[in-house]
């Protein structure tokens, strides 16, 4: 895309223009623009980390993302917004839903970013998404960007699977599901089966059965995410193991009663500087 050359260049560039237009429209409608950095490790032959780098987000990634979102949205709408003789008929569907932000979490987020000099005004509705995008734009490229971006994600509600459609707040979609990755996510496989059933004119599937599967999938997703975070932290500790005594530039990313969290500027590895008072109290 960057060079504008190669096989099928015209077709790819046309798709990219459409993707960028869809992306712009999505944010205008109130989608939240989270740009989280994905940590990767350079490993030696034995799997020991030699360095930390971050996956770069390019227009090609955005192209794939926008058409993936479009496919997920259209499948959810087709299955969930069905009409017979002009009348809406509810059919069982596995949705990926995202509720409005929790006001208590937003208040904590507001207090934290204020320490960096940012003013976050909104507390509910679509105004939160607009204000969040504004703040993330202001923090972009600054030393605290990663910390604020991560905390912004935590301030939002957690997306989950359900047969009860409440829409997807973060994407600003009234209908949304996970359809595009059936080889790695079981909810996508459920959606494929439901779509095939409805395309063939089948009746609505049993809602209770699929709701139980949605609850199970959501629970397992949380466990998988925790395991992923733990594995990344393990590799970061392994990377820093032979660097004890060295000096690094960093910034305070959080505070607690027993010390402060510090994030290194270059690698974004976070650790705790335990307070002397806390150490003395636990001798």
Summary of predicted features, one role per range:
Residues 281-283:
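A short, hydrophobic C-terminal helix/tail in secreted or cell-surface proteins
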Residues 1-279:
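Electropositive polyanion-binding surfaces
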């Amino acid at each position: 895309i960057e060079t504008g050359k190669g096989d099928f260049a015209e077709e790819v560039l046309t798709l990219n223009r459409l993707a960028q237009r869809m992306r712009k429209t999505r944010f205008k409608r109130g989608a939240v623009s989270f740009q989280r950095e994905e940590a990767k490790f350079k490993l030696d032959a034995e799997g020991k980390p030699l360095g930390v780098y971050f996956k770069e987000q390019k227009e090609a990634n955005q192209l794939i993302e926008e058409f993936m979102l479009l496919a997920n949205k259209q499948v959810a709408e087709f299955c969930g917004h069905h009409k017979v003789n002009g009348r809406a008929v509810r059919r069982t569907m596995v949705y990926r839903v995202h509720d409005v932000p929790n006001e208590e979490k937003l208040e904590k987020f507001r207090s934290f970013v204020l320490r960096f000099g940012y003013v976050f005004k909104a507390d509910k509705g679509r105004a939160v998404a607009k204000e969040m995008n504004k703040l993330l734009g202001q923090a972009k490229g600054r030393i605290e960007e990663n910390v604020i971006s991560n905390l912004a994600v935590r301030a939002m509600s957690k997306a989950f699977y359900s047969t009860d459609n409440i829409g997807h707040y973060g994407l600003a979609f009234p209908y949304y599901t996970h359809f595009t990755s059936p080889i790695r996510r079981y909810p996508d496989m459920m959606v494929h089966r439901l779509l095939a059933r409805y395309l063939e004119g089948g009746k609505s599937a049993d809602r209770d059965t699929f709701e139980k599967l949605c609850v199970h999938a959501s629970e397992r997703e949380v466990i998988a995410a925790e395991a992923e975070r733990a594995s990344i932290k393990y590799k970061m500790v392994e990377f820093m193991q032979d660097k004890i005594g060295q000096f690094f530039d960093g910034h305070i990313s959080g505070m607690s009663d027993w010390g402060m969290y510090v994030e290194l500027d270059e690698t974004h590895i976070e650790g705790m500087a335990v307070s002397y008072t806390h150490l003395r109290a636990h001798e």
